[in-house]
Amino acid sequence: MYINGLFLLIFWCLGWGQFGFSNSLYLIIVLLIAILVAYTRRRAILGLTVFLLASAGQYDRVYSQFPYPWVSKDLRIHACVSKLDVTRSGISLLLSNAQIDIPIVKHDKRAKTMYGGLSKALAGQVKVTIYPYTKAAQPQLNGMNENLGLAGLIGHKVVLIVRLKGARNYQNPQHYDYLRWSQLAGQTASGYVRQWLSTGQACHGLNWPQLQLEQLRQRLWQALQGYAEIQSMAPPSVGIWGALVLGQTAALTAQQWRVLAATGTTHLLVISGLHVGLVAGLAMLLMRLLILPLGISSSLGIRLSAWVGLAVALVFALLSGFGLPAQRAVIMLTGLMWGAMWGLQLGFTQRLFIAFFVTLVLQPISASSLGFWLSYTAVLALGLVWYRCPSQQWWYRGMQLLAAQGALSLLLLPVIGLGTGYVSLVGPLVNMVLVPVFSLLLIPALLLISVTLMLTPLAQVFFRLVDVVLSGLWHGLETLTRLTWSQAFVGWIPLGVFGSVLIVSCICLLIRRWHWPLLMLLMPLIFFTLLKSQSPQARVPEHPHTQPPVFITLLDVGQGLSLWVRQGEHNMLYDLGNRYASGFNLVDAVILPEMLSQGVDQLDVLVISHWDMDHSGGLNTLLQQQTVKRLILPTEVKATRESGLVDYADKMSRCASTAWQNLWLDNANILMWRQIALAEYGLSGNDASCVILLNIYGRQVLIAGDIEAKAEAMLVALVGELDSVSLVSDVLIAPHHGSKTSSTADFLAKVRPSYVLISAGKANPYGHPHKKNTQAYWWHGSHWYNTARHGQILVVFTANGEYKVRPYLP
């Protein structure tokens, strides 16, 4: 194996992620020619050829797009159920071998959807959700074993009427790359079930053993939940148990994921290299003990133990759901144990390179995944400490454990910081304690209890003990997250400190000269991450005027609304986007990453226009993570939503019509605003949205919330009553996402906006913005932008009265 091939693989993979398949292929051809001219290393070229062939084989599957004309259409799908999860939002099915019946085009919208003889196979998998309120979509077990319950559906064919859409990212400079994740997972589309037509026979194929293991996994999870309910275990303890043993991460709440991220312990509850390697090690140790009395030679015993360890680790990974981290762990374990399995004498770097190469061959696009780099950096750190270390006394081995944890923390810190933008400052200390506890005590104990539970019922004391231990651990983690310094945004860390960590990491690698090529594993990641972070909106020029510029950002939160107003160190948010029953919310996914990227950790003002979930869904989530000085709630009272806001009573007020006043409490920066509470005039629902007018250096912005025609008419009628207020605005945040029941001609004639900014989800089921509205905007001389098409929209106002509109996408 030659390092040239390694470099080419890294740069091609990362280039694929950044520049597209074709451009990266041209790059690799140029590099290949350079190797042919400079060297004649056949094995490097052979390895590169294998990699390219594997990549080409995956290209169609990875980059297959769900046909846009099928979005939001009723489709009939024939598929095999390969995975099933019961979540807070409903029942989630993962379908494989999907065949779509193409609907016949309807000339009458009222006509029933008909399907012709044409069908198309979908590459990859399809994820659909069955919502409890859709009666026609509920699963039909068709006489299956009632003891199996829903788990009996796994491995069976189903015919469903579904609505699907392809994967799409929220188009903001800072966002979770859901599209890349779905490509890595091989997931082509997602949606929901409208009608369950039939349940067929069992699926037959090469993945039959995996389907049977998945069915067993689901049955074990149902049994574990049943025992836990009988013993009254705390929900967090049950979720942790399921995640550690069966990979049931869906049982963890959004709040639990935030705690894990803040304490740097996410890797402990996601089945990955730590868990798979531990299971393999325990199996190998048990096998060595079993064959010890048989007098088998040492070399044969090592080989036999390695094969058994790998087989047990593979079964455990399959039982855990065989997610991407588990897949990488099995591949890496195979590479690292390759020499032991075949009796070969391979060095650490050779084994690591084999694992690295095989991972890229099987999952080429994983090189742009943060988990890929974390996994190999962690193994590298452990190898630096343990490789070729002679046996020493127990205290020396203990020091090696501490050194290994220190190396992990040091080397993973820059990778995590560059990949996520955050670092956990308490993570190194927490992991110093919890990694040995989980590895040596907790995971083996939970595995033993779980296996025993399958064979015979256990006494209540075991469940109580597990509950006490897991609850205690969780309480400790939650306590650490309350520390103000527990987590930091990379942008807050001085460049010298961050650079020093990178330099020290490099020195640690260079201490052993034969490790220097592996240092290059980090360099492309750093280079491409920094290159990607230089988005056009991130480079906002400094303004020479005394008053700082005002930035108004309409965030892309899908079908919802969130507007961020920023001037100097002052910040206001208007609405917070949606929160779904699964726990996913736009505050965690979009709003907080955007704010933290600018170093913002507190809000001067938070305005909730009205109580619809697509505007207020993330309220509690944001209040748990950000300091809010003033909280302005809707005029209408909603007790069910306000019951958890008692702690903020001294900061709360309600939307009320006001005269012009300074938005900020100090006089250093001036930004005039006024509220118009339409609920005071007898309106309710959407029409009672809190309307905001901003006067920014002589320019006016109208934030209309979800008002519709009736409220618009009320606003027009009130023009003469509200201190001679004028509705004429340079920028209008479109009422009600541009629905056909809003943006009336009279309203637009009074506002006369130069720009209309629409917040709507792509291919949303409501048809927002309506075509008649966009035509009306043009007719009134307004330019309009839609977050569904243009992504995040930034408007910059400078003190000389000039302003510019900058969409994230052209």
Residue ranges and their predicted role:
Residues M1-G17, G301, G339-A340, L453, ...:
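Hydrophobic alpha-helical segments
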Residues L380-A488, S754-S759:
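Alpha-helical transmembrane segments of multi-pass integral membrane proteins
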Residues S22-L32, L374-S375, N431-V437, I493-V497:
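Alpha-helical transmembrane segments of polytopic membrane proteins
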Residues M1-I77, S190, R194, Q201-A202, ...:
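N-terminal leader/targeting segments
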Residues H78, Q138, G149-L150, I154-R163, ...:
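Non-globular, low-confidence helical/coil segments that flank catalytic cores
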Residues A56-H267, F584-N585, A589-L596, Q602, ...:
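Membrane-interface helix/helix-cap signal primarily in integral membrane proteins
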Residues L46-L48, G191, T253-P428, V490-V540, ...:
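Hydrophobic alpha-helical transmembrane segments in multi-pass membrane proteins
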Residues L184-A329, W338, D604-V607, Q700-G705, ...:
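Aromatic-rich juxtamembrane segments at the membrane interface
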